Amino acid sequence: MKNPSRLSSEDRRRAIVDAVKGVFADKGFDGTTTRELANAAGVSEALLYKHFPSKESLYAAMLDDCAKGAAFAEYRRILALEPSASTLVIMVHFVVARFVQGRRFGDIEKTILDRLAVRSLLEDAQFVRLAHKRFTGAWVAKFEESLKAAAKAGELQETSVRRDLRAWFVHHIAFALMIHLHPKVPAVDYKVSKDLLVEQAVRFALHGVGLMEKTIDRYYNPKALSLLA
């Protein structure tokens, strides 16, 4: 390991970002002082400000760093797929599995991200809004394009639920499951394995977005999808 005093500027930035994730997750954005961030990173406040002129810029860099993990690599692969009912199934499974299981994406990184998100929502939601601004626009657009493709192929049963809200509702179902499963003793005993819980939640969500039962049966293979990451 390099001597801390001899780290390059880029290595120093990366080290600071890695060091402060847990602090932000524990105390939130507003509850964290620059002194605490500097102490966690093992640098002075002056050096911290040299690399990150504000807490907001450090927050943004932390989010960018999180976007380099396995989950976001899969996210980008999914966005490259052609819009279709099959893509819709993959998208819903990915979201639910990421929140309910998470093991494929790295438990430590996932735990920090989830804690950051929950803490953010209990405060001013700045971290969550930043994440949405950077990642959800393309995702929601792909989701809507896939709904249109499924409808054109006769694989979607139209409902009164607006198409531009359906991707959000899928996310909220998955996020709520994650919160209830987060404690060491889950808040709800679903009496099924996590694999089966994912499958059931995905089927529920796919019905909600409008896919027909025969379409779900045709494209949804949870065992195969679990091997994609």
Residue ranges, per PLM feature:
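Helix-turn-helix
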Residues: 15, 23-65
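Hydrophobic alpha-helical connector segments
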Residues: 61, 74-112, 163, 167, ...
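Hydrophobic/aromatic residues within well-ordered alpha-helical segments
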Residues: 55, 62, 66, 92-95, ...
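A short secondary-structure junction motif
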Residues: 65-73, 120, 124, 146, ...
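Hydrophobic/aromatic-rich alpha-helical bundle segments in the mid-to-C-terminal region
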Residues: 4, 107-110, 114, 128-138, ...
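Helix-loop "lid/cap" segments that line or gate small-molecule binding pockets
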Residues: 94-107, 115-123, 205-210
